[in-house]
Structures are given as structure tokens and as C-alpha cells.
Amino acid sequence: MSNNKETPEHLQAQNIIVIHPGSLYLRMGRASDVNPCRLLHAIGRRRKPGGRAYRDRVLSVPIAKPKESLSEFEECRLQVSHTLQSCVQSDGRRRYATPPQQISAFNRRSGAETVQASRVDWKDDLPGDKVFGEEVLWLNPAGEFNVHYPIRRGELNLHKDVGGSMSGVMCDLQDIWEYVLRHRLRIDLKQLKQYKAVLVISDIYNRAHLKELTSLLLNKIGFGCCFLVQDHVSATFGAGLGYACVVDVGDQKTSISCVEDGISHPNTRVRLPYGGADITQTFHWMLQKCSFPYKECDQSRPQDAFLLKQLKEDICHVNLDVCGAQEKTFAVHQPQQEKRRFTLQIGDEAIVAPLGLFHTELLSVTGVNKSTPMTQKPSRAQPHPEDCFDAEYLRETGRRGKENLEQTANESGMANAENADEDMVVEGLEQDREGKVNEKDFILPGGQMIGIDQAVLQSIERCPNDELKRKMYGCILVVGGGMKFTGISNWLQNRVALKIPLMYRSEHNIVTSSKDIDAEITAWKGAAIMSCLESAAELWLTEAEWTRYGLRILREKAVFMW
């Protein structure tokens, strides 16, 4: 009996590297791997003598909370709490809640218990000028290292401070990715010409950024060839679905689009600038309101930020059968301090915080509730001087061609019948064929951003025909690591089901993790599957093609509408 690991397909998959970069984590692995390597998507760089200090934070800086925001937050929190109290458990009994005063009194009495453990120190004595992975979290804030996260809120982290230029961000990405290739995947970088790369990109993309990323893979890191695939398209492959309304909740953004037969419809795409990290900060705010026993917790410290993230993942849920106060223990081990254990009591705050995805007033702690959503810019709004087939180039050359043609016709005295055709071409290009998607459609009166359930409805309503809308209402795929709360998929299903137009109602189903794949790696797994298909042979873009043709070849070979 032959060994499956020796088949040509498996050998080919071993030479394909699938890269899924996120705002918090990077997932990278061979297409033949069951699971990818997961690494903190950050880098520590030793400052040059006299250089400016700069550190990206794990959690965004909380905004100064004016009275209006606090009252808005508190009003929404009370409204959600009353809604939960009016719900019933699965056995038909009414839910009950422990009074907040009782929970606060317990937490105020809860003291720290010292635990015997080995001492933890700052990692200031690391060799070299670069630090990767979890060690970045243990760099002394007063030390010699700057900390950079190259992706924030799903976009390249471009800013005007240290390391915020395009070249700086590309250098960070190159160093992090090459570190994983060398030290996690054990690949000799000199042999990379024998390897292919698949890069999972955001469903809403910037064409100039894609050019830089393709150059990074082929020219700088040195892969033999590559192709790019949108995360929502690869998620449907990973879940084994031919179509779905994909809801991807990451650490710092939530993106939604409708995918059918490997195509993400541009008009249905929207990215909301909130995710799991915003839920973490909302949860911390609620913990403070009920006398969180770890009083010196500071979101700006990486260790405390990850502690809060872990508490959110361990405690938060949307299980209506869990009522009253729950006791949880957690440990705190700061550098150069003793390890301490705390006991925490918490009530419905564990449910209210995740529901911030539906009631964005609860996210006012970070200010994202008043941010502007992002939709896909049409190609005419993203002209590039190297792309001789984009709308801007054709518009300009078409106009010049028309002027030259008119001049020739006038000189010869001939009636130019071709001018009518030329006019049609130019005017057709000047129209926005992709339709207009207004970001304001995702903002409620008063500037409040809509919740995830309303965003799903808005996205599906932008589908081009009724049949596609009906299919999307029947298949909503939830992926990403920011919405992994028990029971939240049922909550989303119920919220959406109440608002589905009668003509589209059918058997309603939300797929959370099809084929037993973790929602966090569904998109990565789908890209790995795509790369091994026979049809993928036409997608690969070689370094020679890229160097010769540039953006033209990406336009021709891209698996998405350029």
C-alpha cells in the first residue's frame, strides 16, 4: 500500500507556502500542513543611538470619554441587560441576574494570593537587533527596542512616525516572514526559487498595496512564483461551500461580502473597523465597573492586554442558560514581580460585552462606533501609472485618440463616422460600471455605526439579483478569531432572521466552522486547498513575468476582479 505522503500531489503541496497575515497574528505554513504556524505579527527593532522611541500597542488607545459617550454607553448597557433579563432559558424558565452591587462587593473583598513561581524578567539582553514572536511582548518599555505591528485594522500600518513609511512596513513584513520561513518552517532562503507562495489578502484591497506585496514575495523574499487570493473567497473553499455571505471577525476589523463560485461581489463588500480587540476593551471597562480585583491592570502594557484578551476568551459567552454570578480565577505574572492569583465574580457582563458587535454604542470606549466603514473603491478611483489598462489610462488615451482622429478628419474633409464609436468608448469608461456603494449606508442617524447583523443585511441587499439574495440569506459563514463566543452564532441567526424580507425566507443556516476546521484558520486552509487544484496552474505568476509586465500580468492572472 503506497504512502500518501509520497504522492506527487503531496510533494507539490510541500513546496507551496500559504501566508495569511493579520493585524495581530501571522499564519503561515505549507499547503500540506494540517495547521499553519501562528506567530505574533510584530517585530522589535533596536533603536539607533539617539533614535526616537516608538511602540505600537496591542490594544488601541482608549479615547477620552466625554459625558455624552459615557451616558450613551451606560444607556445601551442597561438596555441590553434588560433585554437579557426578559429572555428565557432553554427549559422555558426566565433568566435571573445577580445584583451588580453584590458582585462589586465580592470583588472588592477579593485579595491577591501569592503563588510560588520562577522569576520572570524583561528580555532586554537578547542578541541581535531584531526580536520576533512572543518575545516582543517581554521587551522593556524603557529599553532600547521599538515595536512595530505592520498591519492595523486590516490595512498596512502606514503613519508619519518612526517606521510608518511604505518601505518601513515592507521591511517589517519581509523580516517577520523570512524569520518564520527559516526558524519555523526550516526552509533555506537560498532555495526559495523552488517554492511557490499563496498570499491571502483582504477582500477590500488597495491596488498599490497589492503591487508592493507582490514585489515583496517575488523580488525581495525570492519565491519562484505566487498568486493572491481574497480571504472571503478562500474561506468558502475552506468551508467547502460554493456560495456564502462571509462574515470575517478578526482582532481589529469585521469584513462582510457575498461570495459565489469563487467571486466576491464588489458592491457587497464592507469593512467595519471593530473586532475582537474592541470587545476586549469594552469587557475591561465593564470589569472596572464591577470592581475588578486586579486594580493596576493597564491596557497599554502588552502583558495586561493579553491577560484581558485571555479573560475575554475564557469568560465571555452568549449562553442564555448561564445565569447569576460566576466565579473565575486568573493569574498575573508581571516581569520582576511575584506571581499572583485573583478570584473574580462576574454576572451578565460576560454576555453584554460580546453583544457590542450588535450594539456598537458599547464600543464607544475605543471610539470605533463613530468611525467610517470602508467599501471597495472602484477601479477608476485607484489609477496606477504602471497599469496601462486601468480606466484612467484608457480615458486619457481615448480622449487623445479622439482629438487626433477629429483633426485628421477635418484635414481630409471626410465625415468621420468612427467618432461616434470613439465617443461611446470614452463615455462608457467614464461611467461607474461597478455601481455606487455609499459608506454612509452603514452609519445610523447621529453618526453611530451599524451592528454586524444590520451590516449583513446591507451587504446581501446589494447582491445583483433576487436569486442570489435568497441564496445568501440561507448561508452565512462566520470565520475569524474575534467572534468565538459560545452561542453568538445563534444570536446572529435570530437577529438576521427577524429582518429577512418575506420573499427571501427559507431554511436559514449559519455555518460557523464547517468540516471541523477552526474558524481562525478557515481562510488559510481554503487557500491551501485552492493552491493544489489543477486549475491553479494558470494562476501562478512568476518572477520573470512580474519583472517584465508588472501590474498588467497581475490584472490578467488575478483570481478577483481587478
Swiss-Prot record:
One of its GO terms (biological process) is chromatin remodeling. Keywords: ATP-binding, DNA damage, DNA recombination, DNA repair, Nucleotide-binding, Nucleus, Transcription, Transcription regulation. GO terms for cellular component: nucleus. InterPro entries: Actin (IPR004000), ATPase_NBD (IPR043129). GO terms for molecular function: ATP binding. ATP binds at residues 248-251. It comes from the Eukaryota. It is found in: Nucleus. Component of the chromatin remodeling Ino80 complex. Exists as monomers and dimers, but the dimer is most probably the biologically relevant form required for stable interactions with histones that exploits the twofold symmetry of the nucleosome core. Plays an important role in the functional organization of mitotic chromosomes. Exhibits low basal ATPase activity, and unable to polymerize. Belongs to the actin family. ARP8 subfamily. This is Actin-related protein 8.
